[in-house]
From Swiss-Prot:
UniProt-listed GO biological process terms: isopentenyl diphosphate biosynthetic process, methylerythritol 4-phosphate pathway involved in terpenoid biosynthetic process
InterPro entries membership: DXP_reductoisomerase, DXP_reductoisomerase_C, DXP_reductoisomerase_N, DXPR_C, DXPR_C_sf, NAD(P)-bd_dom_sf
Species in which this protein is naturally found: Clostridium perfringens (strain ATCC 13124 / DSM 756 / JCM 1290 / NCIMB 6125 / NCTC 8237 / Type A)
Name under which the protein is recorded: 1-deoxy-D-xylulose 5-phosphate reductoisomerase
Keywords associated with the record: Isoprene biosynthesis, Manganese, Metal-binding, NADP, Oxidoreductase
Length: 384
């Protein structure tokens, strides 16, 4: 039996991970969980899965959960804040950590888990974006497997199995194109948060839905792929594939292209990461090739969707530039959702930050966290 901690258990990836655990009850034990504000769902999870440790990152929610757990006689330790996240990620009794929290908050617990020798099922792409050099070095030194949960990176990971890494010609990273595929800049001027949250293929949280609409999500995935697969940016090509059936591909030097296909369901890559190197029974609808009318492919429009272009630039510059990109994007998405800035201001402000801050420093946990704070403070003071 594999023992698991889930960081961000009440979010989209976290709840779908629970679906996988329900489907394979005999194979997994949920030992630790973390959450933020959704105490009602957290209580339901505690009652169903009986985790020993629960970390809450929101102070009022933490106090509320402590009272509920005590009043109902539930046997779990409730811990507060970043200290709690790190504890849940580094428990002696766990084998693997599912990092499904959104944003920079996932960095420290992920790094500490790696240092404790825990395998990582990685859904928190920001960790590799801002500190890929550090994370991959620590993983290598500690003999830890980084198993991608993103559908695209899982597809690449699977397409690489049994093939020589030095024979890769390019990685073909697929993108649905988001809800505004084919839009012009003029069309994007009137985009509201409500429209941007409606993704055509995937059911996701708010932040990743906005990122998918701007193509920043794909940009972050380009940087993530660079670190996961040690692939130069010039050899990572984004391919818009609206049907979202091919989750990504690898083209080899002999011209062969190996792809992973499946229905758009995050439970598939979650299950693969948790069971690697084995494959488990089918948890999702199987792909019916006869129902697929067509598979189409387009080049992304980098002039209209500038976030993808900025991500490539940040990745190429390296050092702490991806930290600036990521921190600026997180704040811009928050301000856009709160209707403080317009949709087209998102890439404008990100580019402004990339031109403002010094990125040419060593990638350490300290430097990443400090620069991230500076970038956020700058945007809040100027635009909030």
């Amino acid at each position: 039996m594999k023992r698991i901690s889930i960081l961000g258990v009440t979010g989209s990836i976290g709840t779908q991970t629970l679906d996988v655990l329900r489907f394979h009850k005999e194979d997994f034990e949920l030992v630790g969980i973390t959450a933020n504000r959704n105490i009602e769902l957290t209580m339901d999870i505690i009652k169903e899965f009986s985790p020993k440790y629960v970390a809450i990152n929101h102070e009022e929610s933490y106090k509320k959960l402590v009272d509920l757990v005590k009043s109902q006689g539930l046997k779990c330790e409730v811990i507060y804040g970043m200290e709690g996240l790190v504890k849940v990620a580094t428990l002696d009794e766990i084998d693997i950590v599912v990092t499904s929290v959104v944003g920079m908050i996932g960095l420290k617990p992920t790094v500490e888990a790696i240092r404790k020798g825990k395998d990582i099922a990685l859904a928190n792409k920001e960790t590799l974006v801002v500190a890929g050099e550090l994370v991959m070095r620590e993983a290598k030194e500690n003999g830890v497997k980084i198993l991608p949960v993103d559908s695209e990176h899982s597809a690449i990971f699977q397409s690489l199995q049994g093939n020589a890494h030095n024979k890769i010609d390019k990685i073909l990273l697929t993108a649905s194109g988001g809800p505004f595929r084919g839009f012009t800049i003029e069309d994007l001027k009137s985009v509201t948060p409500e429209r941007a949250l409606k993704h055509p293929k995937w059911n996701m949280g708010q932040k990743i839905s906005i990122d998918s609409s701007t193509l920043m999500n794909k940009g972050l995935e380009v940087i993530e792929a660079h670190w996961l697969f040690d692939c130069p940016y010039k050899d990572i090509e984004v391919v818009v594939h609206p049907q979202s059936i091919i989750h990504s591909m690898v083209q080899y030097t002999d011209g062969a292209v190996i792809a992973q296909l499946g229905v758009p369901d995050m439970k598939l890559p979650i299950q693969y990461a948790l069971n690697y190197p084995n494959r488990q029974g089918n948890i999702s609808e199987k792909l019916d090739l006869f129902k697929i009318r067509e598979l189409t492919f387009e080049k992304p429009d980098l002039d209209t969707f500038k976030c993808l272009k900025l991500a490539y630039e940040a990745g190429e510059k390296g050092k702490l530039m991806p930290t600036i990109l990521n921190g600026a994007n997180e704040v811009c998405v928050e301000l856009f959702l709160n209707k403080k800035i317009t949709y087209l201001q998102i890439p404008e402000i990100i580019e402004e930050c990339m031109n403002t801050f010094d990125y040419n420093k060593e990638v350490t946990l300290h430097n990443v966290i400090n620069l991230d704070k500076e970038v956020r403070q700058y945007i809040y003071e100027k635009y909030n």
